[in-house]
């Protein structure tokens, strides 16, 4: 059976594809000792409230190559409530005015903030933006309240191969890893990479 929220459980008899993934959990308990991130000309990051359709388009565009599937199954009403929650914040990366990626922060477990999602649209991958954008996200979290105790994120071996090295280089430290079984509905159209195919 697939691990995760109730809405992610396949319906009885539904065709699924199985992925066996290694999930790595990381955290950062203090801001890295480095200068604040400076965005180059033409690059901007802005916090925004997205509606369900805009969020789904961005989530699917960024996460499609990397098996981001859970939010695809989240009911619209539940996703709308999540996006409107005061503990949820989403910031968009733009390059010359064009949306290039996003990150989603979740402060529901304050004094810890989780980086729920982070990534770039495919056409912007490989242009040196990922680390810059990640450093900016870290700065945004740690510039706030003094009661903050840390920031967390997780990744897996279905993600971009640079994801884990980038998190480690940004100052996150691994504290746990585990194996998960994902039964992903075939109707979502994913091609399961050989390395995680169950």
What are the residue ranges of the model-derived segments?
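A conserved beta-strand-loop-helix scaffold within acyl/acetyltransferase catalytic domains
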Residues: 70-77, 83-122
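Short acidic/polar active-site loop segments enriched in Thr and Asp
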Residues: 89, 149, 173
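Acyl-donor-binding surface of acyltransferase catalytic domains
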Residues: 1-43
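Short amphipathic alpha-helix that is part of the acyltransferase structural core
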Residues: 39-70, 193, 198
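Conserved acetyl-CoA-binding loop-helix of GNAT-fold acetyltransferases
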Residues: 120, 126-143, 165-169
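Conserved GNAT acetyl-CoA-binding A-motif
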Residues: 142-155
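Conserved catalytic-core motifs of GNAT/GCN5-like acyltransferases
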Residues: 21-26, 173-189
């Amino acid at each position: 059976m697939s691990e995760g929220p109730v809405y992610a459980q396949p319906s009885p008899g539904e065709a699924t594809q199985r992925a066996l993934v290694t999930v790595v959990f990381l955290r950062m308990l203090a801001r890295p000792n480095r200068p604040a991130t400076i965005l180059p000309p033409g690059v901007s990051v802005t916090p925004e409230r997205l509606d369900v359709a805009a969020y789904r388009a961005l989530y699917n565009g960024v996460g499609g190559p990397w098996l981001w599937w859970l939010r695809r199954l989240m009911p619209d009403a539940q996703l709308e409530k999540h996006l409107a929650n005061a503990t949820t914040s989403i910031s968009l990366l733009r390059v010359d005015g064009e949306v290039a990626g996003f990150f989603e922060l979740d402060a529901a477990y304050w004094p810890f903030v989780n980086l729920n999602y982070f990534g770039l649209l495919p056409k912007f991958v490989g242009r040196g933006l990922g680390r810059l954008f990640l450093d900016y996200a870290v700065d945004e979290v740690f510039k706030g309240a003094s009661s903050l105790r840390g920031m967390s994120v997780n990744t897996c071996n279905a993600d971009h191969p640079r994801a884990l090295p980038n998190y480690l280089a940004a100052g996150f430290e691994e504290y746990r890893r585990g194996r998960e079984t994902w039964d992903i509905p075939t109707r979502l159209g994913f091609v399961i990479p050989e390395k995680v195919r169950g």
